Amino acid sequence: MWEAAARRWLESKGLRFIAANVRERGGEIDLIMRDGKTTVFVEVRYRRSAQFGGAAASVTWSKQHKLLQTARLWLARHNGSFDTVDCRFDVLAFTGNDVEWFKDAFNDRS
């Protein structure tokens, strides 16, 4: 449900959809989008309230590591790598009725 809402929201901001719920060994990427020539790996989070830090705070270092690994595998399957493909990792956080878009929230150099 939240991935579909995130996709619509990001498309309204000009991003183009590539894939959803991409599973590779050890992880899953909620959305893969294109922003111009940049491949964007999107983690979608929802929390009812900002108590305990809200949605964005739930993307831990461990989760970031899994997303990086999953993206690395996906890129390899599509003849790419972090060295050859312009990409970034965004977090789209739904907290109650608020939407926050954290562009380039983390990267493979973090």
Curated annotation (Swiss-Prot):
Signal peptide range: none
Top-level taxon of origin: Bacteria
GO molecular function: nucleic acid binding
InterPro entries: Restrct_endonuc-II-like (IPR011335), tRNA_endonuc-like_dom_sf (IPR011856), UPF0102_YraN-like (IPR003509)
Family: Belongs to the UPF0102 family.
Protein name: UPF0102 protein CKO_04542
Source organism of this protein record: Citrobacter koseri (strain ATCC BAA-895 / CDC 4225-83 / SGSC4696)
